[in-house]
């Protein structure tokens, strides 16, 4: 009797660098590649149509590539725990292969399937290929705790064994002794469904800006490397107006779905760098996107509450406001700030926005203007963002909301000045907010300041055709910086650790921060004026922080100050220690250090609260 094998695709939707699939094929007489799709999940999950379309395109491309190997993809409807016992019997399966899933939900799911496989006498093959490293080994090297500073993470991986090279692509030669039983009704039973079959209305759906699949991913990788080689520049690209638009060399969604191997990307970058730089050793910063992704995966792998504030041992318990109306305006691009609204419109239409655009809208929602929980923003990104990844998405939102990892709350992105400096002419605004197309560049970022004659000439009256600003940014940012200052002063006293950020060495604050882990967080100055705040650090010193607060919006009387009526609820924390447990749960790990309460961090970790200073290589 022959050996029948199944490879279960989840992420890792590719044939190149797929060690689990190669191992599955070795010694097998038949192999079936399956993807399990829950139709109920499609209709009830918080995943938008662009992400579903990208996934289905990935599956279609995978099926097309398998056809070239005289094989097919089997898309099976149902739940894994229900599907596999049936498949094990029906197909007489001897071995099952999977790519290791490091996320808590995935580990729990896979443990259940391994148990079912064991009961059925099925061998389970697991290989790591969605991350560069074995995350458990990083944690073991750190004494059993995940590193919570990027510098500590870099130190640990520098002690790891060199990375293994990507395995060879699955070819007809690899498959020659292995067949796939395919019958005439395959498409009917196991074909990739359409969006319509999953219950989506596709009327008026524009064509995909980011086509899914391994074929597209590898084409983009070559373009990406060709561009780098042509300019011989491995530094972080400067942001400009063109950076805001989707790039044909962008890679982040393909890494997210595993259409592109992170190891292949890593070694291709290494080879190109050595070729251009004449064999000099590449700096860690060359791999910035990949290493930040790895950092967040490591932080999340043993923390099932990583995407929650409550019960999350590394998250500061900040008393955010609940304001559904304000949240909806932000999510739907109706804040009255063209820069914010254009970004959210692009996100909803295309499924992608530039990493610094992510910084801007995340800051606006949380600590900058609306004081709404990062959890709410994370859910919107999970729905709309093609490259939204459970670990990276949650970690990045905690980061930029100053809930974990770094605490530079005195930096505030101005919803007017940031965009104006990036795209002075306002072409990005006109592209995504055509209602403002008629405004001259002088007023396109703050159209409420335009004289009535300008608004009439633009055929757009603010408050009628386009909303007035929902908050006064100058007042909101001042209040929220004060709120954060009080929280961290109290937390610092409670833990006895120096948790407050120190003054950046660069007076503009550039070089620290980051959202989505894909690029250095150029901390952008605000709208113009700057104020100072004296912040007490955990060691008893007082430093003057440069707080970029922005211009007040003249001519905007009557703007609702939504989400700020509870300011006093946080200010009282500075006056007594009986409220401290609200900030960081007692008995948990100290924020940003991985050190238990009462112990002093080592000097390396103690200095990391200012956030990592590392040049990050963007792939977007």
Swiss-Prot record:
Q: Which Gene3D superfamilies match?
A: 1.25.40.80, DNA Cyclobutane Dipyrimidine Photolyase, subunit A, domain 3 (1.10.579.10), HUPs (3.40.50.620)
- LIR 1, short sequence motif: residues: 50-54
Q: Where is this region: Disordered?
A: 593-620
Keyword check for Transcription? yes
Q: Where is this motif: LIR 9?
A: 395-400
Q: Which residues, by range, are in coiled-coil regions?
A: none
Q: Where is this motif: LIR 8?
A: 379-384
This protein's cofactor list reads: FAD; (6R)-5,10-methylene-5,6,7,8-tetrahydrofolate
Domain Photolyase/cryptochrome alpha/beta span(s) in chain numbering: 3-132
The UniProt entry annotates the motif LIR 7 at: 335-339
Subcellular location(s) per record: Cytoplasm; Nucleus
As annotated in the record, motif LIR 10 runs over 411-416
Q: Where is this motif: LIR 5?
A: 271-276
> Which residue numbers does the motif LIR 6 cover?
285-290
Q: Where is this motif: LIR 2?
A: 82-87
Record's superkingdom? Eukaryota
Q: Does the keyword Transcription apply?
A: yes
Record text on subunit structure and interactions:
Component of the circadian core oscillator, which includes the CRY proteins, CLOCK or NPAS2, BMAL1 or BMAL2, CSNK1E, and the PER proteins.
Biological role stated in the UniProt entry: Transcriptional repressor which forms a core component of the circadian clock. The circadian clock, an internal time-keeping system, regulates various physiological processes through the generation of approximately 24 hour circadian rhythms in gene expression, which are translated into rhythms in metabolism and behavior. It is derived from the Latin roots 'circa' (about) and 'diem' (day) and acts as an important regulator of a wide array of physiological functions including metabolism, sleep, body temperature, blood pressure, endocrine, immune, cardiovascular, and renal function.
Similarity-based family: Belongs to the DNA photolyase class-1 family.
Q: What is the protein name given in its UniProt record?
A: Cryptochrome-1
Query: What is the phylogenetic placement of the source species in the record?
Result: Eukaryota, Metazoa, Chordata, Craniata, Vertebrata
Gene from which the chain derives: CRY1
């Amino acid at each position: 009797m022959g050996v029948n094998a199944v490879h279960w695709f989840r992420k890792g939707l590719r044939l190149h660098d797929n060690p689990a699939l190669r191992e599955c094929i070795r010694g097998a007489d038949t192999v079936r590649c399956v993807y399990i799709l829950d139709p109920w999940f499609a209709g009830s999950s918080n995943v938008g149509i662009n992400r579903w379309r990208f996934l289905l395109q990935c599956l279609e491309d995978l099926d097309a590539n398998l056809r070239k190997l005289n094989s097919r993809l089997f898309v099976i409807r149902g739940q894994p725990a229900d599907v596999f016992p049936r498949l094990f019997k029906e197909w007489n399966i001897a071995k099952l292969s999977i790519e290791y899933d490091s996320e808590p939900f995935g580990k729990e799911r896979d443990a259940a399937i391994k148990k079912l496989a064991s009961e059925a006498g099925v061998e389970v093959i697991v290989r790591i290929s969605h991350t560069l490293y074995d995350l458990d080994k990083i944690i073991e090297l750190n004494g059993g705790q995940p590193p919570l500073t990027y510098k500590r993470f870099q130190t640990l991986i520098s002690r790891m064994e060199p990375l293994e090279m990507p395995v060879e692509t699955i070819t007809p030669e690899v498959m020659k002794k292995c067949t796939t039983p395919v019958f005439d009704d395959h498409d009917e039973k196991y074909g990739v469904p359409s969006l319509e079959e999953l219950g989506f209305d596709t009327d008026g759906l524009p064509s995909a800006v980011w086509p899914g699949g391994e074929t597209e991913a590898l084409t983009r990788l070559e373009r990406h490397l060709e561009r780098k080689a042509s300019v011989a520049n491995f530094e972080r690209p400067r942001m400009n107006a063109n950076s805001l638009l989707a790039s044909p060399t962008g890679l982040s969604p393909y890494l997210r779905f595993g259409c592109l191997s992170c190891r292949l990307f890593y070694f291709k970058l290494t080879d190109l760098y050595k070729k251009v730089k004449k064999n000099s050793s590449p700096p860690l910063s060359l791999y910035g996107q990949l290493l930040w992704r790895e950092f967040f995966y490591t932080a999340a792998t043993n923390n099932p509450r990583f995407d929650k504030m409550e019960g999350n041992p590394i998250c500061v318990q900040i008393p955010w406001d609940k304001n559904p109306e304000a949240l909806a305006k932000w999510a739907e691009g109706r804040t009255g700030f063209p820069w914010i609204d254009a970004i959210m419109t692009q996100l909803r239409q295309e499924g992608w926005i530039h990493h610094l655009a992510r910084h801007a809208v995340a800051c606006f929602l949380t600590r900058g203007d609306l004081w709404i929980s990062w959890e709410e923003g994370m859910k919107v990104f999970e729905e709309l963002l093609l490259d939204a990844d459970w670990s990276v998405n949650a970690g990045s939102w905690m980061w930029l909301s100053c809930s974990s990892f770094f605490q530079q709350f005195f930096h505030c992105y101005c919803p007017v000045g940031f965009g104006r400096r990036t795209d002075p002419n306002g072409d990005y605004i006109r592209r995504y907010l055509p209602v403002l197309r008629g405004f001259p560049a002088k007023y396109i970022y703050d159209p409420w300041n335009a004289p009535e004659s300008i608004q009439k000439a633009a055929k757009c009256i603010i408050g009628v055709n386009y909303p007035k600003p929902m908050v006064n940014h100058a007042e909101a940012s001042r209040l929220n910086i004060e709120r954060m200052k009080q929280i961290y002063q109290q937390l610092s006293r409670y833990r006895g650790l120096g948790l407050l950020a120190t003054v950046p060495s660069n007076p503009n604050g550039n070089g620290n921060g980051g959202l989505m882990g894909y690029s250095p967080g150029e901390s952008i100055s605000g709208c113009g004026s700057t104020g100072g705040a004296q912040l007490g650090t955990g060691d008893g010193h007082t430093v003057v922080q440069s707080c970029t607060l922005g211009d007040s919006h003249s001519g905007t009387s009557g703007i609702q100050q939504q989400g700020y009526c509870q300011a006093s609820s946080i200010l009282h924390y500075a006056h007594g220690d009986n409220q401290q447990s609200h900030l960081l749960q007692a008995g948990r790990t100290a924020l940003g250090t991985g050190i238990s309460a009462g112990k002093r961090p080592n000097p390396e970790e103690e200095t990391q609260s200012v956030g990592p200073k590392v040049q990050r290589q963007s792939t977007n």
